């Protein structure tokens, strides 16, 4: 009996070691999205749709699945949650570029697979295409741009590459805009400025019409105010002097009558 007990204990230890060293994939649930177990990027285009199917593998019980769009949870129908779940992303637009969809295991949300949309589209340009400014003032031409892949940006003037003057021209570029600043505009700055965006998909352009008008000669307010004050004071002094003169004449007219009465 002692020998049998020893054999049973050794077999139990062996089985315990086997279980401990089994690969995790064989003992825990694994998620797949469209057959992929790792996060991945899905290439797509505007106007298309994408179907994302999440499934749980190696499960020993029914598993609830959750879908998230960025940080917001997606509402799923009751029959679209257990062991397998799908979402359809329809009418994909340029604004969906970079958006992530994540499938998570309900009981352990650290188990997840994410899909990031890579929406490719040619450059889209917009901006205030007509500006009138006074000579000597500053102006900014802002070309709003959206593109994926990112476009190479340039400024043209009257169909030729703009010759930048370091002292007067400044270019600023962000992921969403391409800006040309001109300080102290001059009459030769008149013309059509073109915002050019070149990508591997297409080249687009947007024209900005700049009109430089003569500088308005402002009427100096201070001299006018000073002149009005002088005129006002002159009139006041004139009235005072005239009043004194009238009073003297009245006094002279009054004196002869007084002597006659005596």
From Swiss-Prot:
Gene Ontology cellular-component annotations: cell surface; cytoplasm; cytosol; mitochondrion; neuron projection; plasma membrane
CDD domains in the cross-refs: Ig
Keywords annotated in UniProt: Cell membrane, Cytoplasm, Disulfide bond, Glycoprotein, Immunoglobulin domain, Membrane, Repeat, Signal, Transmembrane, Transmembrane helix
Organism for this UniProt entry: Homo sapiens (Human)
SMART domains: IG, IGc2
Name the UniProt record assigns to this protein: Transmembrane and immunoglobulin domain-containing protein 1
Alphabetical list of InterPro entries matching this protein: Cell_adhesion_signaling, Ig-like_dom, Ig-like_dom_sf, Ig-like_fold, Ig_I-set, Ig_sub, Ig_sub2, Immunoglobulin_dom
GN (gene name): TMIGD1
GO terms of molecular function: cell-cell adhesion mediator activity; protein homodimerization activity
């Amino acid at each position: 009996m002692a020998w049998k007990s020893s054999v049973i204990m050794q077999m139990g230890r062996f089985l315990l070691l086997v279980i401990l060293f089994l690969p995790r994939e064989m003992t825990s649930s694994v998620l797949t999205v469209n057959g992929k177990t790792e996060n991945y990027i899905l290439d797509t285009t505007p106007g298309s749709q994408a179907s994302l199917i999440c499934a749980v593998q190696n499960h020993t019980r029914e598993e609830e699945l959750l879908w998230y769009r960025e940080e917001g949870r997606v509402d799923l129908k009751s029959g679209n949650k257990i062991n397998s779940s799908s979402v359809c992303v329809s009418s994909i637009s340029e604004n969906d570029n970079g958006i992530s969809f994540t499938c998570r295991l309900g009981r352990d949300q650290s188990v997840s697979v994410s899909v990031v949309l890579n929406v490719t589209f040619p450059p889209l340009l917009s901006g205030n295409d007509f500006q009138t400014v006074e000579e000597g003032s500053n102006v900014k031409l802002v070309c709003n741009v959206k593109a994926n892949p990112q476009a190479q940006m340039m400024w043209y003037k009257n169909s030729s590459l703009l010759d930048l003057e370091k002292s007067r021209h400044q270019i600023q570029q962000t992921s969403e805009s391409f800006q040309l600043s001109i300080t102290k505009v001059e009459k030769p700055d008149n013309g059509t400025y073109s915002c050019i965006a070149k990508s591997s998909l297409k080249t687009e352009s947007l024209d900005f019409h700049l009109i430089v008008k003569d500088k308005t000669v402002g009427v100096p307010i201070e001299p006018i105010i000073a002149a009005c004050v002088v005129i006002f004071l002159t009139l006041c002094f004139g009235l005072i002097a005239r009043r004194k003169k009238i009073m003297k004449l009245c006094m002279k007219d009054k004196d002869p009558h007084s002597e006659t009465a005596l």
